[in-house]
Every structure is written in C-alpha cells, then in structure tokens.
C-alpha cells in the first residue's frame, strides 16, 4: 500500500509539473505576440522630404509645389529643391504664385509654359537669387 501511495504522489507531482510548463509556454507565446505587435507599431514608414514639407505649407503653396514638380523634370532637380531651407522654399513658392497670378489673358498658358522654363533655369543657379532671376514676362506682354 505504501508503494502505491508513493507512486500516486509521484504521478501527481509529474502531472502538476506538466501543467506548469504549459502555463509558462502559453505565457511565453502571448508575450512574444505582444512584443511583435509593439515592434510593428514602432516600424512605421518614415515620411519623405516632400511629405514633411507639405505638412507645413498652405494650400496655395501646395498647389504651386505641384506645379514646380512638373517644371523640375530633370534627375534630382526636385529633390535638390526639397533640400533647401524651408523658409526659402516658402518664399520661392510665394514668388511663383505672384508671377503666375500675373499670367492672364488669351495666351496665358503659353506664358505659364515659358515661365516654367525660366523657373527651371533660375533654380539651376540656386534658390538664393531665385526671386530676382525668375520673373515672368506676363505683365510686360499685356
């Protein structure tokens, strides 16, 4: 009888130890899932320079940034423009807006197209002298 009691106690101990391992395993699995979820949350895609700039621009400036993007078609020209100081970019976009506002009338599309080429050439020399070197001929032709 003593042997049966001892064997029974050993059986219960073994059974109890198996259950405790299952609990640890499930806790470990849930911990791993939680860690994976946290890693996914922290691995957001970084924003591009253009997206970061767009957050700081007004609607008019965003419109003229799109216009400028179509003007700067060369390899890396637009990226180079995005590398300039934010205040200089805003100043350039405001200058573009004021010059394009002057282009009205019958041949305004041609004037805007010509101004696009002027802007492209003016930005080739940098943004510092952009406002003085990029002028449209719109008002002079009216």
Swiss-Prot record:
Where a lipid (S-diacylglycerol cysteine) is covalently attached, the residues are 18
Under InterPro entries, the record lists:
Mlp
As for membrane topology, the entry says: Lipid-anchor
Stretches with biased composition (Basic and acidic residues) = 33-54
Signal peptide region? 1-17
Lipid attachment points (N-palmitoyl cysteine): 18
- Main subcellular location of this protein, as a coarse class: membrane
Q: Where in the cell is it found?
A: Cell outer membrane
Q: Which UniProt keywords apply?
A: Cell outer membrane, Lipoprotein, Membrane, Palmitate, Plasmid, Signal
According to the record, the residues making up region (Disordered) are 22-54
Q: List the disulfide bonds.
A: none
Q: Which GO terms describe its cellular component?
A: cell outer membrane
Family membership, please give it. Belongs to the Multicopy lipoprotein (Mlp) family.
Q: What does this protein do?
A: An outer membrane protein that may participate in pathogenesis. Some human Lyme disease patients have antibodies against this protein. The Mlp proteins probably undergo intragenic recombination, generating new alleles.
Q: What's the name of the protein?
A: Lipoprotein MlpI
- Taxonomic source organism: Borreliella burgdorferi (strain ATCC 35210 / DSM 4680 / CIP 102532 / B31) (Borrelia burgdorferi)
Q: Which gene encodes it?
A: mlpI
């Amino acid at each position: 009888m003593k042997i049966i009691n001892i064997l029974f106690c050993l059986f219960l101990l073994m059974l109890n130890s198996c259950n405790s391992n299952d609990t640890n395993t499930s806790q470990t699995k849930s911990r791993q899932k939680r860690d994976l979820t946290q890693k996914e949350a922290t691995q957001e895609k970084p924003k591009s320079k253009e997206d970061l700039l767009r957050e700081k621009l007004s609607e008019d400036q965003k419109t003229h940034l799109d216009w400028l993007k179509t003007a700067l078609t060369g390899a890396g020209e637009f990226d180079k423009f995005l590398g300039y100081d934010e205040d200089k970019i805003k100043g350039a976009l405001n200058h573009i807006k004021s010059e394009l506002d002057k282009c009205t009338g019958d041949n305004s599309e041609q004037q805007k197209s010509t101004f696009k080429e002027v802007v492209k050439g003016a930005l080739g020399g940098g943004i510092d002298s952009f406002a003085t070197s990029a002028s449209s001929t719109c008002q002079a032709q009216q």
